[in-house]
Amino acid sequence: MSGFDDLGVYYSDSFGGEQQVGDDGQAKKSQLKKRFREFLRQYRIGTDRTGFTFKYRDELKRHYNLGEYWIEVEMEDLASFDEDLADYLYKQPTEHLQLLEEAAQEVADEVTRPRPAGEETIQEIQVMLRSDANPANIRSLKSEQMSHLVKIPGIIIAATAVRAKATKISIQCRSCRNTIGNIAVRPGLEGYAMPRKCNTEQAGRPNCPLDPYFIIPDKCKCVDFQTLKLQESPDAVPHGELPRHMQLYCDRYLCDKVVPGNRVTIMGIYSIRKSGKTSTKGRDRVGVGIRSSYIRVVGIQVDTEGTGRSAAGAITPQEEEEFRRLAAKPDIYETVAKSIAPSIYGSSDIKKAIACLLFGGSRKRLPDGLTRRGDVNLLMLGDPGTAKSQLLKFVERCSPIGVYTSGKGSSAAGLTASVMRDPVSRNFIMEGGAMVLADGGVVCIDEFDKMREDDRVAIHEAMEQQTISIAKAGITTTLNSRCSVLAAANSVYGRWDDTKGEENIDFMPTILSRFDMIFIVKDEHNEQRDMTLAKHVMNVHLSARTQSSSVEGEVDLNTLKKYIAYCRAKCGPRLSAEAAEKLKNRYILMRSGAREHERETEKRSSIPITVRQLEAIVRISESLGKMKLQPFATETDVEEALRLFQVSTLDAAMSGSLSGVEGFTTQEDQEMLSRIEKQMKKRFAIGSQVSEHSIIQDFLKQKYPEHAIHKVLSLMMRRGEIQHRLQRKVLYRIK
């Protein structure tokens, strides 16, 4: 196969020089270098009317004067100047990129003269390449593309520390002290094969032994290099397959340009290196011709923050005009809500809340350096069969960056970050988890209630501070996880039981308070609704089409995905003065309980909201403004945000299911629970036991509600004061 990256075999009869090249080959190289030099000198942009500028000549001069010894060349510019040169660079990049760098060094020498004293020696120039061609996929790389230029997108999941690699080495014989200098080492991850014999012949001296040479470190010329691990994008992974990885090699100015979690598009040379040796004897013969693939990077484009795969730069002017018209529609909010999972009937408020989550609020950086998150977190609790998982699956496809995980199959390290040992350097490196890979997008966590409590605690920091702090194996760092969390969970009893109240939920208050909206999804028995739902499901199954049965005026999935990415990239609304005043007044009313008193005439219930919930309403208002591409969130947006908060979190709190969450408990309930607990402790002493049925009946005769009695019993069991015995019929007092 042509173009194999060999080991740089050293010929002992050509000491001190590079590989001998024939006159024809040398002349061809000189000719190609001259054409590259002409391209860098003469390529210009502009018109006769506006005037011409020499693009690369001016760039070289500007970068060199700033001490940046690199230049970025666009392949399209090279192809328009000389198509043969671009073809050479695509098909044989290893040889021709070196010629291009030598040509760039000569042009830089010309344009920077005269240089100041002490800087007479011209520095080497690194040439980086970029292209607007459509990227390939890691899975599509085959042996035919070996040693060709390739362009692939993906996510950086690991990065090693920057190390040094020799480009020119000097070697010396241990026996006769013969020194050979300035030996070129091939770029990339391949090493250099030392000569086995010393050919220096001196009269009266015995021949030097085998393997006499060693490297003189002080006389070597080194460059920085770094290896990265690239994982293919989640949307490019076929269903049911594992995402594939590729090792990347970066050197010089390409080092330290990316961190784990960055979405990048790589331009590089598809290369091979020798596989690691097997330890078992006799098996080396099997893998003698097998090589491991890697990519030698020659250009990196990092996707802009928060826009991900549907980068705003890829949006055409026609699409931008269409988005402006879409945002100007008076019913854009309803249109977007209808476009979310159109195959699912009903759940209009949940779809509107998901629309707010997809667009997100505005992230704020305060003067003291602290940040306020702009992403909206949403939790759906309730009965099975209410399309919670289907909504999560749709959001994963609809979001510009979406990662879907299930609670039981997710560990703390898999969600946040893990530390592992690099097989090459044996140093510890860090690999980002789901919440790092979803930076700028949405993490969908299904079966949230099935997660282990230890794993659920790991995402506390990621949900509120939007960072993940790691202190393991000598690595102390912080990764960004600026993503929304959309979670779905079932109740403890499978179906929602209104009589059980808080017992339906087995979540800590600390995790519940981090969700901006909490929806309780109930499968209510309503004949008219059941008839409509059954008809809708039958239409979906019979016609296998959702568009015919869904409402008019919705946006298709691809347009919606691009529109969300465009709004997130271009718009960052703030609350208007009138909206802020209105929200402040309503917040005071809700804190005092006046609004609850107006809504409920039978009894006065005080359900205060805290500053965390106030910030949630601000974020929802900003997302409604962002949906319309407005610079400010208006009073109408605040009204709708308050309504969404009312039908989600406040209604859940009213049902008693969120008591204990950030003050979501009435004063009367707390007093009643403490009275029941005191009487229960008086009823039976420590070490005694009593029938559970009889004690519940005694309290029911005293007109206490049954759910309050069960709540006290569960609280005492959780604290370890009582326990069940004899098939859960008897209560035994421990302390």
UniProtKB/Swiss-Prot annotation:
Q: Which domain of life is it from?
A: Eukaryota
EC number assigned by the record: 3.6.4.12
| Transmembrane portions of the chain | none
Assigned keywords, A-Z: ATP-binding, Cell cycle, Chromosome, DNA replication, DNA-binding, Helicase, Hydrolase, Nucleotide-binding, Nucleus
Q: What does the entry give for GO biological process?
A: cell cycle DNA replication; DNA replication initiation; double-strand break repair via break-induced replication; premeiotic DNA replication; regulation of DNA-templated DNA replication initiation
The yes or no answer to whether the keyword DNA-binding is present is: yes
GO cellular component, alphabetical, reads:
chromatin; CMG complex; MCM complex; nucleus
Q: Where's it mainly located?
A: nucleus
List the Pfam families. MCM, MCM5_C, MCM_lid, MCM_N, MCM_OB
Q: What class of enzyme is it?
A: hydrolase
Q: Which residues form the MCM domain?
A: 332-538
The record's catalysed reaction(s) read:
ATP + H2O = ADP + phosphate + H(+)
The protein's matches in InterPro entries, at most eight in alphabetical order, are given as: MCM, MCM5, MCM5_C, MCM_CS, MCM_dom, MCM_lid, MCM_N, MCM_OB
Alphabetical list of CDD domains matching this protein: MCM5 (cd17756)
Q: Does the keyword Cell cycle apply?
A: yes
Q: Which PROSITE patterns match?
A: MCM_1, MCM_2
Q: Which family does this protein fall into?
A: Belongs to the MCM family.
State its role. Acts as a component of the MCM2-7 complex (MCM complex) which is the replicative helicase essential for 'once per cell cycle' DNA replication initiation and elongation in eukaryotic cells. Core component of CDC45-MCM-GINS (CMG) helicase, the molecular machine that unwinds template DNA during replication, and around which the replisome is built.
Describe its partners and assembly state.
Component of the mcm2-7 complex (RLF-M). The complex forms a toroidal hexameric ring with the proposed subunit order mcm2-mcm6-mcm4-mcm7-mcm3-mcm5. The heterodimer of mmcm3/mcm5 interacts with mcm4, mmcm6, mcm7 and weakly with mcm2. Component of the CMG helicase complex, composed of the mcm2-7 complex, the GINS complex and cdc45.
This protein's name:
DNA replication licensing factor mcm5-A
Species for this entry: Xenopus laevis (African clawed frog)
- Lineage of the source organism? Eukaryota, Metazoa, Chordata, Craniata, Vertebrata
